[in-house]
């Protein structure tokens, strides 16, 4: 069945639920999980008029490392073989979905797991969600996990 599960994480409730589902699947199948965080600062242009780009990117990287450390702790506690990766440069600015798909392809993932709604702010309304992009771009199976608060 599944040997390699790519898990995209972003620290949202939906992402946390996706992590739980990836653990369940990996436990059942013996799969390895690769937790991936894509650091992308393109939302900043929609949210603030002035910012220090370097400070913002470092803040995003720090947050990504924290999210990956938390995921790693849960994967270790469950006894799952795993790796983590912080991608600092998306395929192109704002192209988180394309970056996730490219990473899944490069790693030969059997399945991509991610939450349906993450931390994307106003940009989601303008450009569509990361999960929709992954589904439309990937030739691999994709498992989308809804958060409990979605309607």
Predicted regions located by residue number:
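Gly/Ser-rich helix-loop-strand patches that form or flank binding pockets
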Residues: 24, 104-151
């Amino acid at each position: 069945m599944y040997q390699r599960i790519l898990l995209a994480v972003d620290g949202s409730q939906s992402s946390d639920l996706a992590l739980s589902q990836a653990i369940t699947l990996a436990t059942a199948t013996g799969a390895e999980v690769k937790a991936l965080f894509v650091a992308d600062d393109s939302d900043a242009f929609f949210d603030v008029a002035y910012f220090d780009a370097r400070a913002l990117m470092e803040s995003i990287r720090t947050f990504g490392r924290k999210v990956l450390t938390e995921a790693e702790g849960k994967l270790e506690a469950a006894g799952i073989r795993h790796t983590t990766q912080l991608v600092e440069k998306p395929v192109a600015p704002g192209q988180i979905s394309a970056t996730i798909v490219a990473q899944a392809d490069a790693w030969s993932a059997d399945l991509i797991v991610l939450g349906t709604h993450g931390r994307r702010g106003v940009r989601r309304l303008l450009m569509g969600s990361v999960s929709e992009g992954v589904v439309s771009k990937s030739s691999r199976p994709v498992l989308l996990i809804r958060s409990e608060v979605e309607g």
